[in-house]
């Protein structure tokens, strides 16, 4: 907390961490007892008064102690982030909890989300990778009725996508099998985005003259791949932890937050905005968002913060996040989110085209 002197920093940190624990205004006696500073009662009150004047503390009632403002939490969190940035290795128990048990990507991410919610005692979210950068394991075409073909794509990591595509030529089953075999022989192990680009290049005349069967296979493959949108799963765990938070004890406020967590499209947007962050990132609502982003953020998130981190390396695949009250135990949550992010990066790097 370089913006403050050592005494002010120590006092403010003590108040913040006392408030995180108690959810109640913190008085000067509590600060004196917990800080270990040899300050007279008058000096302690003066220091707290100075912090109030600087906008780091507020007094909800004249007879009450002080509570930290969002400005104080931002200063506190930034200091913790600088400390956690020096930790490169994920704790062994996190690695063991996720390694080797979940070969399918969806199951792995559900496990990660559950692990984070259990340890953080907050709501956790994991935004799954979209299929565009997943590698193809197999593509099969199956007749699906008059003029229709079912394309079944199996991707590395166990993701499966199915799409119905038009078949105006009315190909037979044997032809569809040959088309699938051709595409698998040429493109297995490639990313869907790379396959799309390559097929479009071939069909537009960029490659050698194609045989009729090859052209038909590529045309059908192009239809199948172009119909695959970048739909993404969002795994949410720990909503019951809301009940344990003093901020949401009032029924109406709890319902607001629960409603916000049901707005999947908006949660996806919030997580997507943090996917290009270098490491663990903290967003306070509504203080850290403005303009269109503020209008899109669910109203129920006011007074909340989100700790998030991308996973996947240089080309991020998704985001892991924790949502809770601003009065969150950041000393626990920041390294937790960072550790799980690093483990997911290690586990998923080989299944996707990541750096």
Curated annotation (Swiss-Prot):
A single MF term (Gene Ontology): DNA binding
InterPro entries, sorted: GAF-like_dom_sf (IPR029016), HrcA (IPR002571), HrcA_C (IPR021153), WH-like_DNA-bd_sf (IPR036388), WH_DNA-bd_sf (IPR036390)
Pfam families the record matches: HrcA (PF01628)
Record keywords, A-Z: Repressor, Stress response, Transcription, Transcription regulation
Gene Ontology BP, a term: negative regulation of DNA-templated transcription
Superkingdom as given in the UniProt entry: Bacteria
NCBIfam families: hrcA (TIGR00331)
Family indicated by similarity: Belongs to the HrcA family.
HAMAP family for the chain: HrcA
Purpose of the protein: Negative regulator of class I heat shock genes (grpE-dnaK-dnaJ and groELS operons). Prevents heat-shock induction of these operons.
Name of the protein in question: Heat-inducible transcription repressor HrcA
Organism: Nitratidesulfovibrio vulgaris (strain DP4) (Desulfovibrio vulgaris)
């Amino acid at each position: 907390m370089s913006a403050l002197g050592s005494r002010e920093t120590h006092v403010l940190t003590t108040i913040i961490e006392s408030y995180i624990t108690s959810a109640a205004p913190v008085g000067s006696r509590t600060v004196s007892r917990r800080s270990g500073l040899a300050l007279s009662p008058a000096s302690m009150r003066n220091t707290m008064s100075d912090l109030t004047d600087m906008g780091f503390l507020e007094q909800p009632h004249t007879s009450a102690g002080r509570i930290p403002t969002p400005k104080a939490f931002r200063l506190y969190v930034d200091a913790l982030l600088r400390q956690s940035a020096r930790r490169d290795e994920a704790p062994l128990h996190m690695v063991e909890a996720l390694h080797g048990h979940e070969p399918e990507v969806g199951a792995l991410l559900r496990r990660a989300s559950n692990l984070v919610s259990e340890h953080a005692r907050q709501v956790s979210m994991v935004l799954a990778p979209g299929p565009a950068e997943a590698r193809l394991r197999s593509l099969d075409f199956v007749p699906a009725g008059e003029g229709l073909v079912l394309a079944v794509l199996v991707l590395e990591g166990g993701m499966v996508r199915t799409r119905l595509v038009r078949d105006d030529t009315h190909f037979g089953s044997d032809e569809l099998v040959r088309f699938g075999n051709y595409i698998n022989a040429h493109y297995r192990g490639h990313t869907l985005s790379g396959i799309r680009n390559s097929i479009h290049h071939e069909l537009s005349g960029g490659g050698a003259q194609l045989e009729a069967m090859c052209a038909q296979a590529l045309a059908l493959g192009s239809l199948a791949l172009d119909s695959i949108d970048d739909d993404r799963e969002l795994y949410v765990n720990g909503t019951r932890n809301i009940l344990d938070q003093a901020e949401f004890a009032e029924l109406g406020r709890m319902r607001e937050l629960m409603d916000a967590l049901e707005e999947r499209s908006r949660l996806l947007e919030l997580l997507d905005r943090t996917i290009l962050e270098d490491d663990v990132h903290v967003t306070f609502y509504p203080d850290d968002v403005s303009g269109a982003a503020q209008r899109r953020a669910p109203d129920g998130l006011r007074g909340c913060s989100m700790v998030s981190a991308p996973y996947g390396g240089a080309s991020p695949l998704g985001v892991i996040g924790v949502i809770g009250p601003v009065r969150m135990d950041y000393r626990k949550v920041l390294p937790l989110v960072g550790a799980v992010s690093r483990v997911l990066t290690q586990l998923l790097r080989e299944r996707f085209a990541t750096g």
